[in-house]
Every structure is written in structure tokens, then in C-alpha cells.
């Protein structure tokens, strides 16, 4: 901003510096627009969006025309089962095994269900389940991040994950009240 103001004679127009909150969870821009940003300030003729990148060395600036980064969705899945003692796994519906099956299935979405000319990323970033060596828990929680450039691919990916989770629950003989959320 200071650099632009020092060179004000070299450009003309309105300068709006906007720091977007909650950009990683996808709600920041939506909330700014709902709050009336374009009623309070003039619409800019040009937009310049900045974001840090693990690909760039500190102090370097990268640029691309058009799309620079994909949209992001966070998805939480609770894989439910019926816990029990580790010595009697045959009396349980093990959510750790089911969660690992789901994770392996999810890894095929981009390579086998999304068109090769589209871009998508599905990452399982967190798995939480169980607290003891010899106890099968009642549930496992997964945290995923999804990235895509279009709403069509976004919706398709979410739909596939839901289908896989329901199919896995059915294949493991779970009653419908224990299907993943």
C-alpha cells in the first residue's frame, strides 16, 4: 500500500485494500459481500488477490493470469460402529477398519471418477478414533479438505464421498442409524 501511494502519479483510480477473513474455510468472501462491501465502496476496475504459497521462497512473488488457487471445502465425517473389547472383535463393528476402508476408497475419486481434464484434490488430513490399545471405539472422526475449480466438480466430489461412506456402512452390515454423518 505504501509503495502504491508513493507512486500515485503513475496510476489512477481507487485503491481498496481488503483483507479477507476466513479465506481457508470458504466463508470470508461470502460474508464480506453479504455485509455490503460493494455498496460501501466502489467496485474496482481491477482486482489483485494475494496469498502465501508453500511453493515460493520467502520474499518472492509469483503471479498467474486467471485462476491462481482452487476453492476449498472442509468436510467432517463421523464413521460410526459398535465398539467393544479388542479380544472380541467379532462382536463389534469396527469403525477404525471402516474408516481405513473409506480412506482407501476416497483415494480413487480423483483418478477414477473426476474427468481427467478437471482438477480436484481430496486430502484426509486428520483421523481421530479410540483411546486404548485394547478397546475398539464406537466412532472415528475424519477431517478432509476438498479443492476444485468448479461447483460441478465440487458437488460431484462431495456426492461421491457420501455414496462411498453409505456404501461402506451397508457393506459392513451397519443399521441405518449408524451410517456415517
What is each of the regions a protein language model found here?
Residues 110, 162-172:
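A common structural junction motif
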Residues 133-159:
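A conserved active-site cap/scaffold subdomain adjacent to cofactor or substrate pockets
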Residues 77-81, 140-148, 178-181:
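Short, hydrophobic beta-strand segments
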Residues 4-137:
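Histidine/acidic-residue-rich, glycine-tolerant segments that coordinate divalent metal ions
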Residues 122-124, 176-180:
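Generic structural motif
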Residues 157, 172, 178:
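C-terminal catalytic subdomain
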Residues 98-101, 156-164:
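A non-catalytic, amphipathic alpha-helix used as a structural packing/dimerization or gating element
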Residues 1:
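DPxDG-like acidic metal-binding loop motif
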Amino acid at each position: 500500500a505504501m509503495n502504491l501511494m508513493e507512486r500515485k502519479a503513475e496510476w489512477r483510480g481507487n485503491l481498496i485494500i481488503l483483507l479477507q477473513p476466513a479465506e481457508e474455510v470458504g466463508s470470508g468472501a461470502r460474508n464480506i459481500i453479504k455485509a455490503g462491501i460493494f455498496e460501501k465502496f466502489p467496485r474496482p476496475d481491477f482486482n489483485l488477490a494475494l496469498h502465501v504459497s508453500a511453493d515460493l521462497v520467502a520474499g518472492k512473488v509469483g503471479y498467474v493470469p486467471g485462476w491462481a488457487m482452487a476453492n476449498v471445502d472442509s468436510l467432517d465425517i463421523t464413521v460410526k460402529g459398535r465398539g467393544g473389547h479388542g479380544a472380541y472383535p467379532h462382536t463389534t463393528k469396527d469403525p477404525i477398519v471402516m474408516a481405513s476402508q473409506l480412506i482407501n476408497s476416497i483415494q480413487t475419486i480423483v483418478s477414477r471418477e473426476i474427468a481427467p481434464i478437471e482438477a480436484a484434490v481430496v486430502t484426509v488430513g486428520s483421523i481421530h478414533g479410540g483411546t486404548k490399545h485394547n478397546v475398539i471405539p464406537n466412532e472415528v472422526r475424519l477431517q478432509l479438505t476438498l479443492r476444485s475449480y468448479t461447483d460441478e466438480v465440487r458437488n460431484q466430489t462431495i456426492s461421491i464421498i457420501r455414496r462411498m461412506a453409505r456404501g461402506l456402512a451397508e457393506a459392513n452390515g451397519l443399521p441405518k442409524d449408524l451410517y456415517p454423518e
